[in-house]
Amino acid sequence: MKRLGIAHKPLIIVPNHLVQETAKSFYELYPNANILIANKDDFQKQKRRIFAGKITTGEYDAIIMAHSSFEKMPMSKEVEEQHINKQIAEIVEAQSDLKNRSTVKQLESAKQRLEKRLKTLLESKPKDNVINFEETGIDYLIVDEAHLFKNLMIQTKLNDVAGVIGTSSQRASDLYMKTEFLLDKQNGKGVVFATGTPVSNSLSELYVMMKYLEPHILEKMGIYSFDEWASTFAEVTNSLELAPSGNGYRVRQRLSKFHNLPELMSIFRMVADIKTKEDLNLPVPQIKNGKPTIIALEPSNELEEYMQKIVKRSEAIQRGNVDPKEDNMLKISSDGKKAALDLRLVDSTLEETKNSKARAVAEQIYKNWLEGKEQKLTQVVFCDLSTPNADRFNVYDEIKKILIEMGIPENEIDYIHNSKTDIQKTKTFQKVRDGEIRVFLGSTSKMGAGTNIQDKLKVLHHIDAPWRPSDIEQRERKNIKARQHK
């Protein structure tokens, strides 16, 4: 981009564990490039200004840093004040003519939080030793795995409708403030999002992507809010859905259909270059037997008894007999997922039950380990619940214990959680690629996006099911990109 004059000082931000991997790939393509790489230590409080000074005064072909480091680069007080005031104005607009009391209450709470944040900002003393993002000279931003910033605050009258983003995150708000600044500065350009899942489990996520990348185009069309976008391009429907307890059904309003889809895609394609696997003609290995292998286990008597307790808890909540602080549907969903994985996660005093999922997975891993022994083929095991913890029972350590008992050497088993720094992760990934580590366990958040370990990959195991289909896609990309091993 710099050679073509598109950008003077481009910044690439990637998931925390991919900084070194990205830099390595960049140097493979451009061995003589002048790249500034931000390590975790560079953004420690005492070193932050020094590194920001390097960005400001240096001439680089690219700057590469982690998502979390990027968030530590502040905007000026004036820009942040303007940003917060704009959000407050959007809430006031959404509150007009609103009759739904719960939605009014939600919007008012959001407004009060913003007003408190604004008050704190205005009362804070200027920091003379801080270099703001605007002062660094960065004029182009590339965001890898941009879907991780989807939880951008939406001011809407549809808060009680499923399929509308109901949460907001500070990092999404921070990114939006910076992309807004760059788009204004670069006349609608200067920002690129890279993601394989721009929409994962909510239609409103498409609006968020458009708000990030083409707010000026939406405004030219007279679309200034999510509600105006939804009334033009989406439809609220009533649908019959399984109750969270798993016992019975309920009617739920959901934003589930697009309207005027050709027009919507025409607008989105003004900023989106969409490529599918078929478009790119990527070499994709065939899954054994043409589809995933599902291993269904019969529930133990203990698990069936526990699920009946879940149903009774759900019914008590629906009748209003329980204080939400004591029990609620979120707790029930969490406990149900834990119990389905291993009952010891909800009651540590229990022994291993019949048809333990940990043992069933370990048996499959051991079988594949034997089959791939000569070629040193590897297996990746995903589990988002019950990650390693020395103080309590967890599925990771249970699987490892069983595998060692079966005969797999301990040094051939590892967790992504054991690699704390970027350098450690790079070394660990190389060991997996070389087949030194043959059973590698991790979670979607730490290992799901962009992890390059597929060279000798034979099998990928899903121990638990994540909430979003996009998380399954993120997990399986390692297998899709892998060479085919038999």
Feature-to-residue mapping (PLM):
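Conserved SF1/SF2 helicase motif Ia
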Residues: M1-A23, K185-G190
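Inter-lobe coupling linker of SF2 helicases/translocases
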Residues: R48-E93, S102, S109, R113-Y140, ...
